[in-house]
Amino acid sequence: MTSPDLHATRQAILSQQTSPGEQAERCLGLARSPVCAHVFTQLTPDSLTQTAQTPGIEQRPLAGLSVSIKDLFDVQGQVTAAGSVVLADAPPAARDCPAVARLRAAGAGLIGRTNMVEFAFSGVGNNPHHGTPSAWDGRHDRPLGQPGGHVPGGSSSGAAVSVATGAAFIGLGSDTGGSIRVPAALNGIVGFKNTARNTPAQGVLPLSPSLDTVCAMTRSVRDAIVAHEILSGTRVPAAHRPLNHYRLGVCKRYFQEGMDSAAARAFERTLRTLSAAGAHITEIDLPALDELAGLNATGGFSPAESYAWHRELLGREGPRYDPRVAARIQRGAAMKACEYMDLLRGRADWIRRMEQALTGLDAVLSPTVPITAPSRDSVAPGAERDEAFFRANALLLRNPS
């Protein structure tokens, strides 16, 4: 049986079927159990319990319920280490970042900091410093796949598993090229990437400021709406049109290439469900997708912008970085200023042409990832597995990025 979502749990609190204190105890029990091995880099039980015991907390939108924080966000009094040992001795944050402050104001009980890919630079979910969480099937409340475990996706790996297991109702994370959507897909939960800069990114350690987005994972779409409204400070208007008034596009080019049979079956099942509910689904062709490889031939935004932030730290502490992460950051050193400017112009032109191509459509449907989660052993740290790791990383990040 899957864990109840935030909406259902808050309703149960308001009807006195449970209490914030009982829920805090339950979530802490899960967070300390084997199902959450390597999920948290720091637990804050006192913070969660104190929030749950605050008079009137049940009247706030989050009712004192458990929220996990990716180790990329400033929380007052805590070190923002970004899943790395390099920043372990950095001074604690002087204040909450805006995203955390908004969650607290809405009644969030902070259960702890979640593990992540070092410096958020991979979609697989590995962390050689703190261990790699094992993916959890949030739809059926059980471990995903065979003994030994599967990768949870990244970079918001711990955040996803904290939500899927029920240790948290919301997992605060970030998404640059898939870091919310990939782990949400692999753990059977909901991941919503909003518009970049919709939520302030101050106090969030950057990967690529041009693309970084503050967002969250939840166990239901209705919870995702609540989380988005809190983080963005805006209301989501209700849609009053029936589904048969929406035109949805499906593009086989690019998005479905190299898709394994399990992902293909799941995607086809989704299309059948939407069609049966009245949605108009049209196959479309988007030849501009074939230009992406050329557009990013010099490395793309993430290596260049991350290198700008890391270059001095990498020079001093390079051997202490995850070698796979260091290699991707180091690639940014080779990008010339003219190439970066070409990339900015090329991206703007590509977006303009893509918007024109999508005229008349309400949405484009695609599988979030074209493959199921690889086993942890197959992509574990080690040069002998680098080829398998980078192949999996490229496939997992291809569609969302």
Question: What feature does the model see in each segment?
Answer:
Residues Q17-E25, Q53-T54, C97, A262-D285, ...:
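Acyltransferase
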Residues C27, G64, A105, G109, ...:
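Glycine-rich, small-residue loops and helix-cap segments
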Residues L62-V85, H245-R247, G300-E355, P367, ...:
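Short helix-loop capping/hinge segments that flank enzyme active sites or metal/cofactor-binding pockets
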Residues I69, L110-R113, L172-S174, E283, ...:
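General beta-strand structural signal in soluble alpha/beta enzymes
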Residues R95-C97, A101-H228:
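Short glycine/serine-rich loop segments
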Residues V124, H130-G131, A293-W309:
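Charged, often glycine-rich, active-site loop that binds/positions anionic groups
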